Amino acid sequence: MSLPIRNVAIIAHVDHGKTTLVDALLKQSGIFREGEDVPVCVMDSNDLERERGITILSKNTAVRYQDTLINIVDTPGHADFGGEVERVLGMVDGCVLIVDANEGPMPQTRFVLKKALEKGLRPLVVVNKIDRPRADPNTAVDKVFDLFVELGADDDQCDFTTLFASGLGGFAKESLDDDSEDMKPLFEAILHHVPPPAGDPNKPLQLQVTTLDYSDYLGRIIIGRIHNGTVKAGQQAALVKEDGSIAKGKVSKLLGFEGLNRIELPEASAGYIVAIAGFADANIGETLTCPDEPQALPLIKVDEPTLQMTFSVNDSPFAGQEGKFVTSRQIRDRLNRELETNVALRVEDGESAEQFLVSGRGELHLGILIETMRREGYEFQVAQPQVIYREVNGQPCEPVEYLVLDVPEAAVGACIERLGQRRGEMQDMQTSVNGRTQLEFVIPARGLLGFRGDFIRITRGEGIMNHSFLEYRPMSGDLETRYNGVMVAFEEGVATFYAMKNAEDRGVFFITPGTKVYKGMIIGEHNRPQDIELNVCKTKQLTNHRSATGDELVQLQAPEDMNLERALEYIGPDELVEITPESIRLRKVARKKLVKR
């Protein structure tokens, strides 16, 4: 007899409405009290997730529908967090693929769908945001089918069920002509199209650790699906480690999921997704099993990192003024702690005791780690991101990205020209009736470093850019990613309006008057290829004579906002980003002789 359980993952491209759709399922399942204030994107609990509107960490929740427990896992949509996606797909028996009715499949759709198909899952396709202007659900379905075929889906997978929905509107329907006003069709589709979990509750216990959590009261908590057997609170169990060794322990707490809460369970059997406390040394991919006859499950395979960055102790003239954790030991401990839960991350010792080589899946993956550490009070500096090269069949190869741009027609020529300079190869171009053009490129990952700033300028902020890792290909030769030099502060002090106004014609500033600067700090972009030193601390010589015209109202051009993401992609090989809880500064590594003004 099959268990009254369904384990399903929600997968999609970033910003196609996964979390909003899960919100609607939660609200309509009755888990919230009447009148309870429920925030938007209730599944995004992390501050960074709410600010950026993206899911970074996978989340588990469960709802009851017609006496069936539906475990729902909301996964990240960005390939940089693929380590999360790959792990959670091993916990489920089916998935819901969400596609925007206007945009159709995008680069990250390709990534998450490829992972699901490789796992043998049969996706249930939901075309979301059908109530938006410019929505074209039928075209979106055609593009999804083409993508299934392109990714090598078998006949059963290509024969997918399609629903049309609006997560914000809170409804789903089997056809566009239906008048459904709730999510019942989606609940029914999950029950009928997602198979019940396999597994034998009478076999020895096998649970694979897919996620780690931490509680001040319980310590480390392991989360995973029971593949076989039964687990009871208080029982003895064995943890099969990565190296094959066995660590025995006791299940001190057994928790299940209900809505957004965890509830205590006396026992759970094959098919359940549970959280267990009592195993302080557990790591992701290891197997919790029976101590009498331990049987390990295959370790989880995660794609290797494609980008690396050197983290080091801040040694700028302003070092130690704003951070709480500033030493190499504190930075090392924090990075090692991140390794416990961030399965796609790698940390190695650098060239000195104060440097660490951190590898990840992309700029966003490493950028989120840096921003998280910054908010926790850490102060450090990072060097220019570098792609990780590999040798394939004796030939040096580099990571290549699949890039999709949605731009105004007027910007098409400039985008194609700039990507050509970065060794991008155009694969397709489609123009829509609304005056926008979609461009598809294959481009080396290093060709994308620093491109986002150019792209924003070329499209005047009206372009949309998405990309994901495609494969490793033979090296495509040298390329230049930045065409302008930088303006560097000549001395330590406070930037003045007078000095900045006089130097305004030299380029674009990253700072405002009143900003503290030091010798070697990058304060702007020069409008010529070479770097230049500027004295932005110079003050106006006051006299007892008034100007004939009086002091006119003079304004400076607005500075370029150099946030963390922009700073990481902007810096060159001889530059660093200085990161503190209060500031993000750019600086030169070793000061060379520059053109002086």
From Swiss-Prot:
GO CC entries: cytoplasm
UniProt domain tr-type G: residue ranges: 3-198
Protein's recorded name: Large ribosomal subunit assembly factor BipA
Any single Pfam family the record assigns to this protein: GTP_EFTU_D2
Encoding gene, per UniProt annotation: bipA
Tagged with keyword Chaperone: no
Alphabetical GO biological process terms: ribosomal large subunit assembly; ribosome disassembly
Protein family (similarity comment): Belongs to the TRAFAC class translation factor GTPase superfamily. Classic translation factor GTPase family. BipA subfamily.
Cited CDD domains: BipA_III (cd16263), BipA_TypA_C (cd03710), BipA_TypA_II (cd03691), TypA_BipA (cd01891)
Function description: A 50S ribosomal subunit assembly protein with GTPase activity, required for 50S subunit assembly at low temperatures, may also play a role in translation. Binds GTP and analogs. Binds the 70S ribosome between the 30S and 50S subunits, in a similar position as ribosome-bound EF-G; it contacts a number of ribosomal proteins, both rRNAs and the A-site tRNA.
Subunit structure, as described in the record: Monomer.
Catalytic activity from the UniProt record: GTP + H2O = GDP + phosphate + H(+)
EC number(s) on file: 3.6.5.-
Keywords in alphabetical order: Cytoplasm, GTP-binding, Hydrolase, Nucleotide-binding, Ribosome biogenesis, RNA-binding, rRNA-binding, tRNA-binding
Cited NCBIfam families: small_GTP, TypA_BipA
Lineage of source species: Bacteria, Bacillati, Cyanobacteriota, Cyanophyceae, Synechococcales
A molecular function GO annotation: GTP binding
Residues the record lists as binding GTP: D15, H16, G17, K18, T19, T20, N128, K129, I130, D131
UniProt-listed HAMAP family: BipA (MF_00849)
UniProt xrefs under Gene3D superfamilies: 3.30.70.240, bipa protein (2.40.50.250), Elongation Factor G (Translational Gtpase), domain 3 (3.30.70.870), P-loop containing nucleotide triphosphate hydrolases (3.40.50.300), Translation factors (2.40.30.10)
Location in or out of the cell: Cytoplasm
